[in-house]
Swiss-Prot record:
SUPFAM superfamilies given in the database record: KorB DNA-binding domain-like (SSF109709), ParB/Sulfiredoxin (SSF110849)
Organism: Vibrio cholerae serotype O1 (strain ATCC 39315 / El Tor Inaba N16961)
A Gene Ontology cellular-component term: chromosome
This protein's name: Probable chromosome-partitioning protein ParB
SMART domains xrefs: ParB
Top-level lineage group: Bacteria
Gene: parB
InterPro entries membership: Chromosome_partition/occlusion (IPR050336), HTH_ParB/Spo0J (IPR041468), ParB/RepB/Spo0J (IPR004437), ParB/Sulfiredoxin_dom (IPR003115), ParB/Sulfiredoxin_sf (IPR036086), ParB_dimer_C (IPR057240)
Keyword Membrane part of the UniProt annotation: no
Gene3D superfamilies assigned to the protein according to its UniProt record, in alphabetical order: 1.10.10.2830, 3.90.1530.30
Function: Involved in chromosome partition. Localize to both poles of the predivisional cell following completion of DNA replication. Binds to the DNA origin of replication.
Lineage per the UniProt record: Bacteria, Pseudomonadati, Pseudomonadota, Gammaproteobacteria, Vibrionales
Length: 293
């Protein structure tokens, strides 16, 4: 497939051909989208889902909450659409609001009708959704990659367009290199971006195996970095490191619950020794009471 140049598609959105001005233009995107175009109440049945929607996680629970909000407060931010030559309107931004409005039983929804061609719609949809705070890291990474490929942009140019640092853009784009199983853990928020960045040091089955351990044992980012480092230096000892980190996490949790210092040590015969340290005598009675309860 031939890559599209930056050209008219992005200019239609940013109203400029100068990359030096794109950051300022995108920073005021919300205002410009409100000011430009035609506001109208459209029949909900005349709207069609956009083909550039980066969001995958349209969970029933989230839609139900949004539908309840729309029932009580209405739609505050208009849905951005464009007219289709075949009739009806295509959603550029606001598909969740549209689906929730249908669920809430609305017949019409407020819309901002934009006059944009295909490439302009691609840029507008991707950038509007990338700038949303509730996209998960994997959705944002995939949307950034599509924006980059669609307009043949460098990491720096993508950063200028969306108003983020080049380092942030590069780190997000690297998430697309993760194994599919690890991506799913990130999409379902079983892993955070910090975990994923550490896991990028591993490959293939090893990456998946360690990611599953991290998610199951709810390791911190720091613990994940330690585990990955050990895997790279001595793969045969990775299991022991994982168990040590799990014991460390358990010790910390017990210390918080008992309000006392708790240490857990594995003995050579496979057993474990738990030590509870108290700095004041009267805390012993409190500890006994907690253990009895």
């Amino acid at each position: 497939m031939t890559k599209r140049g930056l050209g008219k598609g992005l200019d239609a959105l940013l109203a400029t051909s100068s990359l030096a001005r794109e950051k300022q233009q995108v920073a005021s995107l919300s205002q410009s989208m409100s000011a430009e175009g035609e506001l109208a109440d459209l029949s909900i049945s005349n709207l069609k889902p956009g083909i550039y929607q980066p969001r995958k996680d349209l969970s029933p629970e989230a839609l139900e909450e949004l539908a309840a909000s729309i029932q009580s407060q209405g739609i505050i931010q208009p849905i951005v659409v464009r007219h289709l030559p075949t009739g009806g309107y295509e959603i550029i931004a606001g598909e969740r609001r549209w689906r929730a409005a249908k669920q809430a039983g609305l017949k019409q929804v407020p819309c901002l009708i934009k006059q944009v061609e295909d490439r302009g719609a691609i840029a507008m949809a991707l950038i509007e959704n990338i700038q949303r705070e509730d996209l998960n890291a994997m959705e944002e990474a995939q949307a950034l990659e599509r924006l980059q490929n669609e307009f043949n942009l460098t990491h720096q140019q993508v950063a200028e367009v969306i108003g983020k640092s080049r380092t942030t853009v590069t780190n997000l784009l690297r998430l697309n290199q993760l194994s599919d199983d690890v991506k799913r853990l990130l999409e379902t928020k079983q892993l955070e971006m910090g975990h994923a960045r550490a896991l990028l040091m591993l490959e293939g089955e090893q990456q998946v195996e360690i990611a599953q351990q991290v998610a199951k044992k709810q390791l911190t980012v720091r613990q994940t970095e330690q585990l990955v480092k050990k895997c790279l230096s001595d793969p045969s000892d990775a299991k022991n490191v994982s168990e040590d980190l799990e014991i460390q996490q358990l010790s910390q949790n017990l210390s918080e619950k008992l309000a006392a210092k708790v240490s857990i040590v594995r003995t050579p015969n496979g057993k474990s020794k738990v030590t509870i340290s108290l700095d004041e005598p009267h805390k012993l009675e409190l500890l006994i009471a907690k253990l009895q309860n």
